[in-house]
Amino acid sequence: ETVLPDKFPCRQGWIPARAQVSEAILLAEGQKSAVTEYYLNNGEWPKDNASAGVASSAADIKGKYVESVTVAKGVVTAEMKPSGVNKEIQGKKLSLWAKRENGSVKWFCGQPVTRTDDDTVADAKDGKEIDTKHLPSTCRDTSMTN
């Protein structure tokens, strides 16, 4: 039996949360090279967007589903918009962060973290983290991941 396109169980115009989250990851990843370059040149993580050399206002880095992208001590955190996105991810966040590794840096992606010192990050869960089920398998690192 042939299933016609109009028989699919999804509403017209409905976009899955994971597809919307991918925009947040792309926008956050867009800041990685600036953060890496700053770290390699200065030996410390950039404290904010301006020192990283990216848009000074976090709200200037935004998309259709993303409210803002913030750099804080080298941790790049993307926050979803409070409306116009899947209800399960409204206002929720994810982070990208790097750790030193053999003179270079290795990047991680997952639920929000905060940098406690040069080599350590801690979970920054406050009820505003994007549920792991909405994160792609490539973005499920934790603060403990090496």
Give the ranges of each region predicted by the language model.
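Periplasmic/extracellular, small/polar-rich flexible segments of pilin-like filament-forming proteins
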Residues: 40-146
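Amphipathic alpha-helical segments typified by the pilin-like N-terminal helix
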Residues: 1-38
